[in-house]
Regions:
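PDZ-domain C-terminal substructure recognizer with occasional recognition of PDZ-binding tails
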Residues: 40-76
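Short, structured beta-strand/loop micro-motifs enriched in basic residues and often containing a Trp
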Residues: 2-10, 30-33
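Conserved Radical SAM active-site core
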Residues: 59, 66-209, 220-249
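Structural preference for beta-strand elements that scaffold enzyme active sites
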Residues: 144-146, 182-184, 213-215, 261-263, ...
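Flexible glycine/acidic-rich beta-alpha junction loops that bind and position SAM and/or redox cofactors
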Residues: 157, 193, 210-237, 257-279, ...
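Conserved PDZ fold ligand-binding element
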Residues: 16-34
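Radical SAM enzyme core and accessory elements
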Residues: 4, 273-434
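Terminal peptide-recognition signature
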Residues: 14, 22-25, 50, 94
Length: 434
């Protein structure tokens, strides 16, 4: 583990106390600091006692007075103060196993780290946890934990996760529920494996455990599945069945608990060719990051932003998105044109030749497909708008390692990056750019 302090934030409690980069944090309030969870938990109090080791090996103690919950302002070599824990499963539906060869190494790393669940919202299977670590989650009141459930029948969960001990983590879920640890769940539906009565059983078990919410999402299948288990995609009929089952239990939960608890991802409605539910269905949009309510939220936000738009005299544009969202984004652009008839713009759903045509989400569109399908398009706008989820977080790089600048050069157009909410899309369309 790395508890060596690499920098101290200016003006922070730690800087005011004279803590310097290069010192090692050993203890807070007489508790050994193992990783970032210990650090976050034990420095919450308004008065904290620190034990530090200086570069020459000597140790010193000091007490810092600060606001309750205020961060000390210490930074470490890695965010976790430790290495992320790799996944020990061999899931039948694992997307990483379906990646093409020769991509950057980080895309092949599978994490399954409870700390990243709490800190970053990652979904984890809990199969990496030891009993001691599970107890630490309870003791430190680490919450919420986001859990990849997949199934609650022990043998089925072992099979789906490719882990002979996968059923043990079901005990952790129950222990967390009894201890009041908040949990959100995710079930990836693989037709013929964990749908139908198996899905019904999983939902009923999670109701008993007491999850805050659970998303039901369709399995994603790329064209790179040679040597992997045979899985079938979610069909129109199957999508309708899943929606009906989830809505049945959602209505029960709403009556009993005041929340639907279980929500289908937008992709199910697209596949079933059914209209999206109204905004009230999604409650607080608890599962937005899993694609639950993303389209409804975007549509409502865009139309709200459109009310404040004042002029359609902007450069022509092409909105590039995934095939799944294409008709919805096209509807929004049509609404914008109703208000501003002079607006010149189009929406293009990019066919995913890179991963396979069954992959339709915008977050998996590559630069190669983007360029190939737009470069010779006669109606290509003066600006090309893309959602930020096409790029690596915080970087101007696509999944296939092409940069924004390379794509701009290939298209001869400037890219406008829009966040994935409707307000940002509206702003990007009506933005006056030099």
């Amino acid at each position: 583990m790395s508890t060596v302090i690499t920098s101290v934030d200016a003006g922070s409690p730690a800087e005011r106390a004279g803590i310097r980069a290069g010192e090692q944090l050993l203890m807070i309030n007489h508790h050994e600091i193992v990783d970032v969870l210990d650090y976050r938990f034990f420095c919450y109090d308004p008065s904290v006692s620190l034990r530090l080791r200086e570069a020459d090996g000597t140790t010193r103690h000091l007490t810092i007075e600060k606001e309750e919950g205020e961060d000390l302002g210490l930074n470490f070599d890695t965010y976790l103060m430790d290495e992320p824990r790799p996944c020990s499963n061999h899931c039948l539906f694992c997307f990483v196993d379906q990646m093409p060869p020769n991509m950057r190494d980080t895309l092949y790393f599978k994490d399954d780290d409870a700390r990243l669940s709490f800190l970053m919202g990652n979904y984890i299977t809990l199969t990496n946890l030891t009993e001691r670590e599970a107890q630490r989650i309870i003791d430190l009141r680490i919450s919420p934990i986001n859990v990849s459930v997949q199934a609650t029948e022990p043998q089925l969960r072992r099979t789906l996760l490719g882990n002979k001990d996968a059923d043990k983590s079901l005990e952790y879920m129950r222990a967390f529920g009894e201890a009041g640890i908040e949990m959100n769940g995710q079930i990836v539906v693989c037709p013929g494996w964990n749908d139908g009565e198996h899905l019904r059983r999983s939902i009923e078990d999670l109701m008993d455990i007491g999850f805050n919410s659970c998303s039901i999402v369709p399995v994603g299948l790329t064209k790179f599945r040679k040597g992997l288990a045979r899985l079938e995609p979610v069909t129109k009929e199957k999508a309708g069945e899943i929606i009906d089952l989830v809505d049945e239990y959602g209505a029960r939960c709403l009556e009993k608990y005041g929340t639907r608890m279980f929500f289908c991802a937008d992709e199910f409605y697209i596949k079933a060719e059914r209209p999206l539910p109204g905004e009230e269905y999604y409650e607080e949009y608890q599962q937005l990051d899993n694609g639950v309510g993303m389209l409804r939220s975007t549509m409502n936000e865009f139309l709200s932003g459109l009310e404040d738009a004042e002029s359609g005299d902007v450069a022509s544009f092409t909105v590039a998105t995934g095939k799944a969202a294409e008709p919805f984004i096209a509807r929004l652009v049509a609404e914008a044109k109703k208000k501003f008839p002079q607006l010149r713009g189009e929406v293009v759903g990019i066919v995913n030749d890179f991963f396979g045509h069954s992959i339709t989400v915008s977050g998996l569109v590559t630069a190669q497909d983007l360029v190939a399908q737009l470069k010779d398009r006669p109606t290509l706008g003066e600006r090309v708008l893309i959602p930020a989820n096409m790029l690596r977080h915080g970087e101007g790089v696509f999944l296939d390692d092409y940069t924004v600048e390379q794509v701009e050069q290939a298209l001869g157009r400037r890219l406008t990056i829009s966040e994935t909410d409707g307000y940002s899309l509206c702003d990007a369309i009506f933005r006056q750019e030099p």
